[in-house]
């Protein structure tokens, strides 16, 4: 049986559960796929060229995580789907010798929400994940605000029709989303007292980090604010990516079931 290689680019990357859940799917669906896929973590030095690394490693597909999603968007031969709007790519697939970029974070995030009755959202951070979430939430009709420590990247969100801030807005929000890397460093993304104010008024505190009770989620729990980590988003975006890796032979709903069973 033919072997194909896949992976996930990131820095840091050792925390990633993507290899676990993707390899479970490659094992489960090898008969349908007619190849055996192997998916592995790839620690990418910050100065690396993603396309060169992809081709050098002989990959058929890859996911992209922090901090490379915007850079991945720039090196693709083609961009498809909502990735065109959000300027960030988390899924790379070699199609007819061309590197094609997709974004499955956007829909993966929305599918992960248990409820869909939110009117507005505050996104903390302005990186690739934040862009994908903002695109999807705007598409779903929510009012979206973005808070970032600097003006870097905020022009994208302004063009999208989001309200942008470098200082915490004095407003209430249904959804408060941590799309920064603060949780990976065991830190809060924002001043504790300011966050408390948002959580007391909010309907859901959502952290894209997963696998542990982050300081962000711990504070929400302390205040009895409903909270959610990024585990379901990870699985949904991975299942949607796997559908791309399988050239649509395996629908994401089937991949999701397998991934959910192992993580």
Swiss-Prot record:
Residues noted as binding shikimate in the record, renumbered to the chain: 16-18, 65, 90, 105, 210, 237
Family: Belongs to the shikimate dehydrogenase family.
SUPFAM superfamilies: Aminoacid dehydrogenase-like, N-terminal domain, NAD(P)-binding Rossmann-fold domains
Alphabetized NCBIfam families for the sequence: aroE (TIGR00507), PRK00258.2-5 (NF001316)
Reaction(s) this enzyme catalyzes, per UniProt: shikimate + NADP(+) = 3-dehydroshikimate + NADPH + H(+)
Cellular compartments per GO CC: cytosol
Biological processes annotated in GO: amino acid biosynthetic process; aromatic amino acid family biosynthetic process; chorismate biosynthetic process; shikimate metabolic process
Entry-linked PANTHER family: BIFUNCTIONAL 3-DEHYDROQUINATE DEHYDRATASE_SHIKIMATE DEHYDROGENASE, CHLOROPLASTIC, SHIKIMATE DEHYDROGENASE
Pfam families recorded: Shikimate_dh_N
CDD domains (alphabetical): NAD_bind_Shikimate_DH (cd01065)
Keyword vocabulary terms for this entry: Amino-acid biosynthesis, Aromatic amino acid biosynthesis, NADP, Oxidoreductase
HAMAP family: Shikimate_DH_AroE
UniProt xrefs under Gene3D superfamilies: Leucine Dehydrogenase, chain A, domain 1 (3.40.50.10860), NAD(P)-binding Rossmann-like Domain (3.40.50.720)
Active site per UniProt: 69 (proton acceptor)
Organism: Helicobacter pylori (strain ATCC 700392 / 26695) (Campylobacter pylori)
Protein name: Shikimate dehydrogenase (NADP(+))
């Amino acid at each position: 049986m033919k072997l194909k290689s896949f992976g996930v680019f990131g820095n840091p990357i050792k925390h990633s559960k993507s290899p676990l859940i993707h390899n479970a799917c490659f094992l489960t669906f090898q008969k349908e796929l007619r190849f055996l896929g192997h998916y592995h973590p790839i620690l990418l030095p910050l100065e690396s060229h993603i396309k060169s690394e992809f081709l050098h490693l002989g990959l058929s597909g890859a996911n992209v995580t922090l901090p490379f999603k915007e850079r991945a968007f720039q090196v693709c031969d083609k961009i498809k789907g909502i990735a065109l709007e959000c300027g960030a790519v988390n899924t790379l697939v070699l199609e007819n010798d061309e590197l094609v970029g997709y974004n499955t974070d956007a829909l993966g995030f929305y599918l992960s929400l248990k409820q869909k009755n939110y009117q507005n959202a505050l996104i903390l951070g302005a990186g690739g994940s934040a862009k994908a979430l903002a695109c999807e939430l705007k598409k779903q009709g929510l009012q979206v605000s973005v808070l970032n420590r600097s003006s870097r990247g905020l022009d994208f969100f302004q063009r999208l029709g989001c309200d942008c801030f470098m200082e915490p807005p004095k407003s209430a929000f249904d959804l408060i989303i941590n799309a920064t890397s603060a949780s990976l460093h065991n830190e809060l993304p924002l001043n504790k007292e300011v966050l408390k104010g948002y959580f007391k008024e909010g309907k859901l505190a959502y952290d894209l980090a997963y696998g542990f009770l982050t300081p962000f989620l711990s504070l929400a729990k302390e205040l009895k604010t409903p909270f959610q980590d990024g585990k379901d988003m990870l699985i949904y975006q991975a299942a949607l990516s796997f559908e791309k890796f399988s050239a649509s032979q395996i629908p994401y709903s089937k991949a999701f079931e397998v991934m959910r069973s192992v993580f």
